[in-house]
């Protein structure tokens, strides 16, 4: 693995003023690099490339833009898989373990108690490891090169990710356009995105064809001033994604002027989070198990709801702590169709200037999540026999996303201070606290 980090970024743009109020622009951004990422496994992101191209028309009262993001995994590979396949390259596990066990057992038979377990283990390892690939040798480098250049779905470690994003969005200030900005501010907007996942089966379940996921939505915001003392804002947006029902999320807020340069704010907000594309479509075998999508079809593909059911991690740990015959400890994992995560949040805040020198900005909030998205780990036997779960060598760890049955809560507060001490010198201080409960 190359642990050096290289990052190259290039950008270019052309901006043209069509009129005094209308500007057109085209911008291009390109990045390339090499680094190491650690998640479920360790990944060598080598010669990774990413580009974004954007076209925009911008007016005082509106804008429309379209952009695309293109990515290429380059020569990236799963280093954990590389290590495992290198071990298999010189002698498969099906041959290594019998040779190790045979040598250890024969040593015990010939020497009895005169030979320690460590001595027998060393002899067995020496026998089973004979001919093992040694780093720095031509044989090792040749085998590693072949595995690095072979896609994961063909028994190698290479990622083939050339996924793209296409998007268009616009926003319009209707108040100025219809001449009522002094009475009511009206803002509307809309947007569309399409993700095109193309990993050729090395990350996502897209072996047959590119997976396309569409998301679209729109929003409306109204803002009204009641004299100089109160400003009210109300907004709502609707979003829909390919695999999930649409979500409507309203928000309201009020700002009160309690004194000159002193304001109190209160708000109620709702928001949502669709499962990510990775949550939905990943299909990746790692050194520690299988990462699979949360959509119902993955339960069918991996036979979790039929001949190879999954069992909860806690029950498997309990089973392995007892007798192999006591499979009654095992609890079958229940899969529920995943929903978007939603949150309701309440906030009270204050911002003001005290004594013309001290600016204070503080807030407290409370949030409650419903259908919180969490990772679930289950164990699956390899041949449908419960007793296989007693050993990690005859079972498979499987992980996917589910909604939590509990309501997760978040509570927090923050305080920021800015003090003009003497001419040209400003002192800043801030403190905050955030707690996530019932996760």
Named regions from a protein language model:
Residues 28, 360-439:
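Gram-negative outer-membrane beta-barrel transporters
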Residues 19-21, 31, 59-62, 175-181, ...:
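Outer-membrane beta-barrel channels and translocator barrels
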Residues 297-396:
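Membrane-embedded beta-barrel scaffold of Gram-negative outer-membrane proteins
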Residues 54-244, 361, 428:
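Face-selective signature of the C-terminal outer-membrane beta-barrel domain
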Residues 7-51, 186-195, 209-257, 417-435:
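Surface-exposed extracellular loop regions of Gram-negative outer-membrane beta-barrel proteins
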Residues 31, 36-43, 68-70, 75-83, ...:
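Outer-membrane beta-barrel translocator domains and adjoining extracellular loop/strand segments
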């Amino acid at each position: 693995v190359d642990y050096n980090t290289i990052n190259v970024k290039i950008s270019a743009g052309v901006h043209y003023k069509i009129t005094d109020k209308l500007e057109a622009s085209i911008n291009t951004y390109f990045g390339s690099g090499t680094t190491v990422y650690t998640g479920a496994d360790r990944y060598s992101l080598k010669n990774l490339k990413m580009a974004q191209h954007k076209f925009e028309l911008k007016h005082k009262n509106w804008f429309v833009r379209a952009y695309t993001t293109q990515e290429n995994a380059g020569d990236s590979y799963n280093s954990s898989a590389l290590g495992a396949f290198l071990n298999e390259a010189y002698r498969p596990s099906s041959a290594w373990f019998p040779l190790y066990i045979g040598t250890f057992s024969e040593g015990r038979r010939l020497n009895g108690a005169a030979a320690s377990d460590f001595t027998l283990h060393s002899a067995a390892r020496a026998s089973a490891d004979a001919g093992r690939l040694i780093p720095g040798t031509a044989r090792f480098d040749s085998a590693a090169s072949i595995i690095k250049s072979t896609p994961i779905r063909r028994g190698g470690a290479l990622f083939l990710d050339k996924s793209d994003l296409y998007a268009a969005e616009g926003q319009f200030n209707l108040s100025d356009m219809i001449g009522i900005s002094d009475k009511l501010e009206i803002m509307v907007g809309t947007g569309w995105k399409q993700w095109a996942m193309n990993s050729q089966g090395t990350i996502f379940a897209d072996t047959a064809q590119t997976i396309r996921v569409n998301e679209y939505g729109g929003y409306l915001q109204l803002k009204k001033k009641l004299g100089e003392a109160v400003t009210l804002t109300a907004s709502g947006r609707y979003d829909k994604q390919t695999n999930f029902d649409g979500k409507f999320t309203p928000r309201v807020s009020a700002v009160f002027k309690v004194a000159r340069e002193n304001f109190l704010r209160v708000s109620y907000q709702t928001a949502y989070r669709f499962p990510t594309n990775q949550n939905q479509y990943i299909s990746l075998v790692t050194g520690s198990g299988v990462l699979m999508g949360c959509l119902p079809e993955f339960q069918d593909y991996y036979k979790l709801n039929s001949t190879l059911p999954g069992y909860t991690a806690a029950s498997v740990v309990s089973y392995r702590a007892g007798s192999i015959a006591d499979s009654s400890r095992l609890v079958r994992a229940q899969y529920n169709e995943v929903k978007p995560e939603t949150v309701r949040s309440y906030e009270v805040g204050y911002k003001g200037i005290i004594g013309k020198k001290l600016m204070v900005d503080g807030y407290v909030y409370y949030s409650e999540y419903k259908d919180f998205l969490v990772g679930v780990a289950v164990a699956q036997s390899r041949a449908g026999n419960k007793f296989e779960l007693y050993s990690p060598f005859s079972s498979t760890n499987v992980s996917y996303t589910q909604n939590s049955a509990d309501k997760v809560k978040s509570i927090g507060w923050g305080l920021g201070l800015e003090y003009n001490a003497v001419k040209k010198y400003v002192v800043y201080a801030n403190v905050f606290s955030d707690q996530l409960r019932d996760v």
